[in-house]
Amino acid sequence: MLPMPFFRKHVTCALLLCTPMLALPHPIIAADTEYIAIRKAGSTSIALVLDTFEVTTGTSPALARQATTLVRDGLDFTGLFTLLQPPLNVKTSSLFSSSTINFKALDSIGGAFYAVGTLSSSGGEITLDGQVFEVATGKVLFGKRYRGTESQLRALSHAFSGDVVEFLTGKKSVFGSQIVFISNKSGSKEIYSCDFDGANVHQLTNFRSIALTPALSPDGAYLAFTDFTGGKPALAIRELATGKTTRVAKKGNSIDPAWRNSRELATTFSFEGDQELYLLDSAGAVKQRLTSSSGIDLSPTFSPDGRKMAFVSARSGNPQIFVYDFSSGKSQRLTFSGRYNTQPAWSPIGDKIAFSTWESGGEINIFVINTDGSGLTQLTTQSGENESPSWSPDGRMIVFASNRQGVKKLYVMMADGKNQRPLLAIGGEQTQPSWSLFSR
């Protein structure tokens, strides 16, 4: 059996509201083929000149400045861009075309692409027209129109930002995704959600008890979590469309659910003795026992194709990361460095697994390892307890909990450990973040 500090650390510190995008994009310029940005030699980011949005008659300039700030902050958050201020002589007209933009001036400051837009309002509706030009050729690469109400300006701006990322990189962005996490700001441990950048925090549960380890199904229909309202940890599954919560009653304890796909999830049960991993359907019915060992098995996380599952087991003595293969039904040990490896998180790209290591000096640090056991890399160091890593949907970032400034808060970093910074600032402590898949 694992020592109690491991169980306590994992369980006590281990809805997403899938609101559809209210902005409805309408193509201005057809872009049937993806354009993949080529970075300049020696550069690790895309040099993008972002201009302040223009406004039509009757539209508040402050609204355009707000939209520009939302786009700039969002693109900067991704870590993909070097954002440049436009030169003073970049435009000869508020009507954007290749003939009214000074591409030589843009090239002189190192810009590879130029993003600009127009904001207009009429009858309570606002329209954002966004365009991206290639500096080298002066050609329009991308353009779209987004409509909504003024209260939806953030969604409109992020819809444009997400399309810019997808068009220039060929990959989906984090815009529209959300993060679920645990906070005690209300006095008890409840589940909260926030946008990808820490904005729009919402409390999702109000049990006035303890809720832990939130996990959203890939289709956004269900939220699974560990529920203590009955006095012991039990699996709870909430159907988000109806708000109906099903508590799966089993003898013993249940902790730490994870979804294999939109209709199957795994969790740890102890009703047959040892704490083992089981596969369930979305209603909570057990379909299959996955592990059988003399030690505790917990913390499942699935490969993107659902064919493999990483988990934590003490079968070798101390907790280590193992990988279960559904085709063979066998498990193999993945980690051999470190005596206390926990909280695995499989990258959505499929090539790496992040996890936490409890080190002898008292620090907890986050590492990543290739799925074949090679390439062990430490991402955090000399910053207290860093735990519960969770990948962004595009695999470019990791959100995690850290007490580096005292109380545990949420932080984000790039997948290589660079640019570690706080995600949000709210009262209480925040732990156990889980980054959702793309909103649908």
UniProtKB/Swiss-Prot annotation:
Coiled-coil annotated residue ranges, if any: none
A Gene Ontology term for the protein's cellular component: periplasmic space
One record GO biological process: protein import
The UniProt record lists the keyword Signal: yes
Keywords for this protein: Periplasm, Signal
First and last residue of the signal peptide: 1-30
InterPro entries: 6-blade_b-propeller_TolB-like (IPR011042), PD40 (IPR011659), Tol-Pal_TolB (IPR014167), TolB_N (IPR007195)
Compartments where found: Periplasm
Alphabetical list of SUPFAM superfamilies matching this protein: TolB, N-terminal domain, Tricorn protease N-terminal domain
Record-linked Pfam families: PD40, TolB_N
Family, per entry: Belongs to the TolB family.
Name this protein carries in UniProt: Protein TolB homolog
Encoding gene (name): tolB
